[in-house]
Design a protein with these regions (language model features):
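A residue-level marker of the well-folded mature domains of exported/periplasmic proteins
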Residues: 1-141
Length: 141
């Protein structure tokens, strides 16, 4: 299920969207909605289902957080500034900062997740970094 809040600040709106999805059978809430998404994570806590944080590690929100999809904006900014300083910056092109470049990643994984499952996730992550996984989709359909 996916629903667009069309809002990045109204936590009550995102909470209601998440509650509706949970009522329809969702057992994990993965929000990508800025501050609005905090309401969705609150709904996950309230209903006793997993929540997945976004942008930074949101495990501090409680034991209902499975993990977080993190963005390494700091890495992208640092690398870009460094390339400007050392004269290697080439404007006019897109640079992709994936797992290998620390542009994306996972926050802390809940200690409630069995080690075998964490190991399986880490293996896939390592395989992606090593180029052993084919084309990764970049568009939600």
């Amino acid at each position: 299920m996916n629903t667009y809040s069309e809002d990045f600040s109204d936590q009550a709106k995102c909470k209601q969207i998440a509650l509706n999805q949970i009522d329809q059978g969702a057992s994990v809430v993965f929000q990508v909605a800025g501050g609005c998404g905090l309401g969705a994570l609150d709904a996950a806590k309230e209903k006793g289902v997993w929540g997945i944080g976004v942008d930074a590690d949101q495990s501090f929100l409680g034991p209902h957080i499975l993990t977080s999809a993190t963005k390494g904006v700091d890495t992208a900014v640092f690398d870009t500034i460094k390339s400007i300083q050392d004269g290697t910056f080439k404007g006019g092109k897109d640079d992709v900062f994936g797992l290998a470049q620390h542009g994306v990643g996972l926050g802390k994984i809940s200690p409630k997740v069995p080690k075998s499952e964490v190991d399986a996730v880490m293996k896939v992550r390592d395989d992606i970094i090593a180029g052993k996984v084919g084309q990764i989709p970049t568009i939600v359909k």
